[in-house]
């Protein structure tokens, strides 16, 4: 039996699978994901998942047997309470590696790992719009996959080369504070979709 005196102090911890839509080791979005892990409130436990082993989506490959890397991604998403996606912006759009991960995760349609999951999107870019376009293009995919995306606040880290140091650590205090606020809001948002 739970002691009522301690029950209110025991907060639920949500497991979040996080991935960056960049394969580059020095990616600002990988760095942003590391910063999110560092700044996450106690209610969030963020585990990263790499996307570099995923083959391009191909229905023939799927029909012949789902690749192990895809099964691992799907399992990580299914076991998590939510997703945290750090997206770059390539040519004003969503990077192929990220769209590919969404495509594989949404298959098969009736067994989608994304169905009913809470998600949040953030991004960092050396440009002045901070991945606004790629984020706005990514969100409609969540409508089809029945994934519930946090809409506000938006983490659009512009001029990322000025916000991260040479080791990839987020050093801009205003951005750190905003990211911490975003993560707290995300934890509250996840609570609406889990029991």
Name what the model sees in each region.
Residues 2-17, 58, 148-195:
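Glycine-rich phosphate/pyrophosphate-binding loop and the adjoining helix
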Residues 10-42:
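N-terminal beta1-alpha1 ligand-phosphate binding loop
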Residues 16, 29, 33, 70, ...:
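A general structural signal for well-ordered alpha-helical segments in protein cores
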Residues 19-20, 49, 122:
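Short hydrophobic segments within beta-strands
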Residues 41-48, 148:
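A generic structural motif
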Residues 51-68, 163:
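N-terminal beta-loop-helix "entrance" segment that forms/cooperates
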Residues 65-146:
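Helix-loop-strand module that forms the ligand-binding subsite of alpha/beta enzymes
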């Amino acid at each position: 039996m739970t002691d009522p005196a301690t029950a209110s102090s025991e907060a639920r911890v949500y497991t979040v699978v996080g991935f960056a839509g960049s394969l580059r080791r020095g990616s600002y979005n990988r760095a942003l994901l590391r910063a999110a892990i560092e700044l996450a409130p106690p209610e969030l436990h963020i585990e990263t998942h790499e996307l570099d082993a995923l083959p391009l989506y191909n229905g023939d490959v799927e029909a012949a047997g789902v690749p192990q890397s895809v099964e691992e991604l799907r399992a990580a998403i299914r076991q998590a309470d939510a997703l945290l996606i750090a997206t770059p912006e390539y040519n004003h759009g969503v990077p192929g590696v990220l769209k590919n991960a969404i495509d594989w995760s949404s298959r098969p349609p009736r067994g989608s790992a994304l169905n009913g999951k809470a998600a949040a999107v953030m991004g960092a870019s050396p440009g002045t719009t901070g991945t606004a376009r790629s984020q706005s293009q990514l969100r409609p995919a969540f409508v089809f996959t029945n994934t519930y995306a946090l809409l506000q606040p938006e983490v659009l880290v512009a001029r990322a080369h000025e916000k991260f140091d040479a080791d990839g650590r987020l050093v801009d205090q205003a951005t750190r504070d905003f990211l911490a606020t975003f993560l707290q809001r995300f934890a509250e948002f996840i609570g609406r979709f889990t029991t």
